[in-house]
Design a protein with these regions (language model features):
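Secondary-structure transition/capping motifs at alpha-helix termini
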Residues: 19-21, 50-54, 145-150, 170-171, ...
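Conserved ATPase-coupling elements of RecA-like P-loop NTPase cores
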Residues: 163-176, 208-210
């Protein structure tokens, strides 16, 4: 959903693509609940063909925050988890022609300009791949192609570490090659009007985040740091309850916020009777529970600040999956007015740990060892 940070990022990117600011390079921080993926998808849909945007409340909210209709842009996506280190990947040119290419810069060139894009990068002006990293001036020329057709240029980059870790393990020289590519690419994006680059460098697979993976990640972060604006986290702690509500419940069941209050008041009556600290908070406590309803605010706080920091949960949607598993089982027996830690317990009179809790124990054990 359009969180404050997501709306701010979308506004900045769209205005850059309209030629109205100089924020050319944006980097996404890891987010809770798959916010990274939703952010990249949102950006693509808003500018790929804005004339055909559906009339949905979320779309209108984005447009209202931007202050104008998004400009039409050519979007190129470097999805490194789909780019095989040996075979490459199939990509589509602006004219709809498919071709399998191996090098990241070739994948970018084909999406932006087809055969002409490959020719721009090739030493002999051929529609073929080159093995070495293209220089900044060539990438600048490539990024300028959509502008000649009256379009903005949006480059989306995802899962860089997935590819980089594997490629560097095979060929050590690719460590410098990738650094150079991203250095040249980010510098080129800054120089091209109506061009924006939005990147996520992390790997979903925790196995890519070993010592070598962390070294590569740090080096790439340094490269992006030189050109990017402040990093953006589309989903922050204050958004967690809304993310969970939208993931786990039907829109109609959580649409009427006024209906939350009687349940919160009733729950707080029991809580304040035994919890002096909450009782002292008065109206502030009521607002906190309202914002988090139907989840106990302490539960969402722990899930966000503790469990999402663990590597195995951090780079997957593990928290959401485990939480959903717990809710499905607890719905059969838990009569509590709020969704709290009890949902992770096993069914009463059933021995052992619940399936959800077993998953959490496995993750915790992995972190410790």
């Amino acid at each position: 959903f359009p969180t404050f940070n997501l709306r701010r990022l979308v506004r900045d990117v769209v205005l850059r693509l309209a030629g109205k600011n100089d924020k050319a390079v944006r980097q996404l921080e890891l987010t809770y609940g798959g916010g990274k993926t939703h952010t990249l998808i949102t950006l693509r849909h808003l500018v790929n063909d804005p004339a055909k945007l559906p009339k949905l409340p979320a779309v209108e909210e984005f447009i209202q925050d931007i202050g104008e209709r998004p400009p039409r842009c050519r979007v190129a996506a470097l999805c490194f988890d789909k780019l095989d280190v040996e075979k490459g990947m199939e990509v589509i040119s602006p004219t709809g022609k498919a071709r399998t290419l191996k090098q990241p810069w070739s994948v970018l060139a084909w999406q932006l300009a087809g055969e002409e894009g490959l020719k721009i990068l090739h030493a002999e002006n051929k529609a073929q791949e080159r093995e070495t990293t293209p220089a900044e001036n060539l990438l600048t020329e490539l990024l300028e192609v959509p502008g000649k057709e009256g379009l903005g240029t949006l480059v989306l980059i995802d899962e860089v570490l997935m590819y980089a870790r594997e490629k560097v393990a095979q060929h050590r020289d690719w460590r410098v090659r990738l650094q150079n590519f991203f250095q040249y690419l980010t510098s080129a994006a800054v120089k091209v009007d109506r061009c924006c680059l939005v990147a996520s460098l992390l790997a979903t697979d925790p196995l890519k985040s070993d010592s070598l993976g962390r070294e590569i990640q740090a080096e790439l972060y340094d490269v992006f740091q030189r050109q990017r604006e402040e990093a953006v986290e589309p989903v922050v702690k204050e958004d967690v309850a809304e993310v969970l509500r939208r993931r786990f419940f039907t829109p109609e069941s959580v649409k009427d916020r006024d209906s939350f209050r009687p349940h919160v008041v009733a729950a707080l009556k029991g809580i304040t009777a035994i919890d002096e600290q909450t009782a002292k908070q008065g109206a502030a406590a009521e607002q906190r529970f309202l914002d988090s309803y139907p989840f106990h605010p302490d539960l969402t706080e722990v899930l966000y600040s503790k469990w999402t920091q663990l590597a195995r949960f951090q780079r997957t949607r593990g928290v959401l999956r485990t939480f959903a598993l717990a809710l499905r089982e607890a719905e059969k027996w838990d009569q509590s007015p709020l969704i709290g830690p009890a949902v992770f317990l096993n069914t009463p009179k059933k021995e052992g740990l619940s399936e959800a809790l077993r998953e959490m124990v496995t993750v915790a054990d992995t972190e410790v060892t």
